[in-house]
């Protein structure tokens, strides 16, 4: 008896789904065995990440790195999508791609095997994908299965709900919330306005949740033309973050500067002298961690949505091949990472909430 065409197609689809799940499970098991038994990384034997642009598959020249760089601290921008429109954003919504969850986990395993101790999830807005569930599953995986000392997130905070803390707060060490001003009109000018929602009020609510669910609280501020004269001393002291990261507004060609950019950040720029004046005004804030353009540009290991390292040394974000294709050791050669500057800017610090000994 012949099987009807529709039924045959359905059976084939179910078989393909089961086969795909089996392959993902075997890939995960193989990565775990490599970590446990110390097997060498097959590197180029890995399949190409689905959805990665074809142009990134071209062969790069080997820069001849004498000693492999250890990816101790990695910033994974798994999405470029965002619900805010900050005028100076330097990681804009140029694609809508997000890796399948199991592929992202496979890449995180490779990073762990290569020596990663801290992962920071960013975007875009990381809580946009699947209402924060995608992010939560990665956070739990990194803390529970990879046993990373530090798992952190950078978010604008607008989409975070208390339920997320209840489900995933135990696995998160640090939550960094972007706040560039305590004047709501300035936030609107910058692009952080969201209708009737008040960014500053939301910040205070998130601070309480972090305390309630024992997550270290951090604030990130980008100092620009619209907030450079603001006095934030009392607000920051009242919120009492473990760190207040203060960045100087930075231009990145192709992101917030140049013909193919989605933002025009030139009007937000400030001089080095203006940035120093802001720092002097806030020198008595003990948690202040300043980062000028010089310190910031080459001192971060950045992975994009395809798990490619982004090299910012030329003022652009030039991608390596994906670690899912060639492995971490090969891809990181093209990251442009300045390890000395990473250490000089204080990139290595007490980043596990177990070691922070906070008074919750």
UniProtKB/Swiss-Prot annotation:
Pfam families: Fer4_12, Radical_SAM
Gene Ontology annotations for the cellular component aspect, listed alphabetically: endoplasmic reticulum; endoplasmic reticulum membrane; Golgi apparatus; lipid droplet; mitochondrial inner membrane; mitochondrial outer membrane; mitochondrion
Glycyl lysine isopeptide (Lys-Gly) (interchain with G-Cter in ubiquitin) cross-link site: 205
PROSITE patterns: RADICAL_SAM
EC number, UniProt record: 4.2.-.-
Record localization: Endoplasmic reticulum membrane; Golgi apparatus; Endoplasmic reticulum; Lipid droplet
Compositional bias (Basic and acidic residues): 49-63
GO MF annotations, alphabetized: 4 iron, 4 sulfur cluster binding; lyase activity; metal ion binding
Cofactor: [4Fe-4S] cluster
Region (Disordered): 44-71
Topology term for the membrane: Peripheral membrane protein
Biological processes, Gene Ontology terms: CD4-positive, alpha-beta T cell activation; CD4-positive, alpha-beta T cell differentiation; defense response to virus; innate immune response; negative regulation of protein secretion; negative regulation of viral genome replication; ossification; positive regulation of immune response
Modified residues (N6-acetyllysine): 196
Tissue: In neonatal rat tibia, specifically localized in cells of the periosteum, in osteoblasts lining endosteal and peristeal bone surfaces, to articular surfaces of cartilage and in perichondral cells but not in chondrocytes (at protein level). Expressed predominantly in bone marrow and spleen.
Source domain of life: Eukaryota
Subunit structure: Homodimer. Interacts with IRAK1 and TRAF6. Interacts with FPPS. Interacts with HADHB. Interacts (via C-terminus) with VAPA/VAP33 (via C-terminus).
Family: Belongs to the radical SAM superfamily. RSAD2 family.
Protein name (record): S-adenosylmethionine-dependent nucleotide dehydratase RSAD2
Gene (name only): Rsad2
């Amino acid at each position: 008896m012949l099987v009807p065409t529709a039924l045959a197609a359905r059976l084939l689809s179910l078989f393909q789904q089961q086969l795909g799940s089996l392959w993902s499970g075997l890939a995960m098991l193989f990565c775990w065995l490599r970590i446990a038994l110390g097997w060498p990384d097959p590197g180029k034997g890995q399949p190409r990440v689905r959805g990665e642009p074809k142009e990134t598959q071209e062969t790069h020249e080997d820069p001849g790195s004498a000693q492999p760089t250890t990816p101790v601290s990695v910033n994974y921008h798994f999405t470029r999508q965002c619900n805010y429109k900050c005028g100076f954003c330097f990681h804009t919504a140029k694609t809508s791609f997000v890796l399948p969850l199991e592929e992202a986990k496979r890449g995180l395993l490779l990073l762990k095997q290569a020596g990663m101790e801290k992962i920071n999830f960013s975007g875009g807005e990381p809580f946009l994908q699947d209402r924060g569930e995608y992010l939560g599953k990665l956070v739990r995986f990194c803390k529970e299965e990879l046993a990373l000392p530090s798992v952190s997130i950078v978010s604008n905070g607008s989409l975070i709900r208390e339920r997320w803390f209840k489900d995933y707060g135990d696995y998160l060490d640090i939550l960094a919330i972007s706040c560039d001003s305590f004047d709501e009109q300035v936030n609107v000018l910058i692009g952080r306005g969201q209708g009737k929602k008040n960014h500053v009020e939301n910040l205070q609510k998130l601070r309480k949740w972090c305390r309630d669910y024992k997550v270290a609280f951090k604030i990130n501020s980008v100092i620009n033309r619209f907030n450079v004269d603001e006095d934030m001393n009392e607000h920051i002291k009242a919120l009492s973050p473990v760190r207040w990261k203060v960045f100087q507004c930075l231009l990145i060609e192709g992101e917030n500067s140049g013909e193919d950019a989605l933002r025009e950040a030139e009007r937000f720029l400030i001089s080095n002298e203006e940035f120093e004046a802001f720092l002097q005004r806030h020198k008595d804030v003990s948690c202040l961690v300043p980062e000028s353009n010089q310190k910031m540009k080459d001192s971060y290991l950045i992975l994009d949505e395809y798990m490619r390292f982004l090299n910012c040394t030329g003022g652009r974000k030039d991608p390596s091949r994906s670690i899912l294709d060639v492995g971490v050791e090969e891809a990181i050669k093209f990251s442009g990472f300045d390890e000395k500057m990473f250490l000089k800017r204080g990139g290595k610090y007490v980043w596990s909430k177990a070691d922070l000994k906070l008074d919750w």
